[in-house]
Amino acid sequence: MPQRLIPALALSAAAALFASNAAASSGDAWEAFRTEVSKKCLSAATSLEKASAVVDPFGSKSFGLALVIGTPKGSKTAVTQICVYDKHKKTVELGGELTPETVTIKAPAKAR
């Protein structure tokens, strides 16, 4: 094997290893982000029973976005609220309750 080829192969292997670790970290970071948005949105939805959150996988540049679906206490009809998570302040705000006549949303069976 030529002497010049060994450093090139070592550099290629190191680059591939770094890229795979970066991709895994990035995936882990996005999963942690989605978990944080879900937890914060569900905690803020105190007026809803049996609430679940459907999180936009990446949100926007500044905000995480989710739909929170649940039944208002004392009601039998499910509603949806839009939840906005500020990525910098780590705070959430909920929109008003959207009824099924306004928007139709079906939460996936695996929603939290």
Regions found by a protein language model. Name each.
Residues 1-23:
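Classic N-terminal secretory signal peptides
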Residues 5, 20-112:
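Mitochondrial intermembrane space
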